[in-house]
Regions:
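Alpha-helical structural segments
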Residues: 7-18, 22, 36, 53-73, ...
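Short, hydrophobic secondary-structure boundary micro-motifs
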Residues: 28-29, 102-105
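Amphipathic alpha-helical packing segments from all-alpha helical-bundle domains
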Residues: 109-142, 150-165
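C-terminal peripheral helix-coil segments that are non-catalytic and often amphipathic
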Residues: 131-135, 153, 169-215
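Short glycine/proline-centered loop/turn elements that form peptide/ligand docking sites
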Residues: 24-31, 51, 137-138, 144-151, ...
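Hydrophobic alpha-helical connector segments
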Residues: 70-103, 110-111
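Helix-turn-helix
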Residues: 19-54
Length: 215
């Protein structure tokens, strides 16, 4: 992607984030996005097939960047602290984009839900943690290669989907939302083999501004 394309992408990202905070993407047209972003419709289609796809890709990019920041070098030694810090970063992202996620995760939403995107992103993140050897599988010595693959993939989907469900419940709590309380709850819900830090002080330190979601 060249510099001009990156500038266009940035304008599209700002536009869809603004519009999606107001109403579902099913009510947003490509023409409206293009007009606000100062581009034509054909340029829009070079970046996404539909408004919902554009929003999902923008949010997924932000979440993936946070994951890389906190988990790119995760190992078995630092997994609890790194995973907890990544969880806090995801919570802050969701809190910053609360208007968007409230619309995109609403029970009465018809189509264009953000839940599948979140499930995909977090499942991919968990699989990468497994691939780095940062998690010790229970009874690993008794598992065949096929059983290990089944456990790993099942565990990734299980942890990701459960975390997304918990994020959604937390999003419904009144602002200012309590991250520490969420960590206490999710710590009780996660399986015992999942690395998670019980002392949350360092993870709750103010976020580096460079890692925060951009408007």
């Amino acid at each position: 992607m060249d510099a001009r394309q990156r500038r266009t992408r940035a304008r599209l990202a700002r536009t869809i984030l603004q519009l999606a905070a107001e109403r579902p993407t099913s009510e947003i047209s490509v023409s409206e996005i293009a007009a606000r972003a100062g581009i034509n419709r054909s340029t829009f289609y070079q970046h996404a097939a539909a408004p919902c796809e554009l929003l999902e890709s923008v949010l997924a990019e932000e979440l993936t960047e946070l994951s890389m920041t906190h988990l790119a070098t995760v190992s078995a030694d630092d997994a609890p602290a790194a995973i907890t810090s990544a969880t806090v970063a995801a919570l802050r992202h969701i809190d910053e984009r609360a208007d968007i996620y409230r619309v995109g995760l609403g029970d009465d939403l018809i189509g264009a839900s953000l839940q599948p995107m979140l499930n995909r992103v977090f499942t991919s993140t968990v699989l990468e943690i497994f691939e780095r050897g940062a998690i010790t599988l229970p009874h690993a010595e008794c598992l065949s290669e096929e059983q290990r693959e089944l456990f790993t993939r099942s565990a990734a989907h299980f942890v990701a989907a459960g975390s997304v469900a918990a994020f959604r419940v937390w999003l419904d709590t009144p602002a200012p939302r309590d991250i520490a309380s969420f960590l206490e709850v999710i710590g009780e819900l996660l399986p015992s083999w999942w690395p998670f830090q019980t002392e949350h002080g360092p993870a709750l330190a103010p976020a580096d501004e460079s890692t925060l979601a951009r408007p």
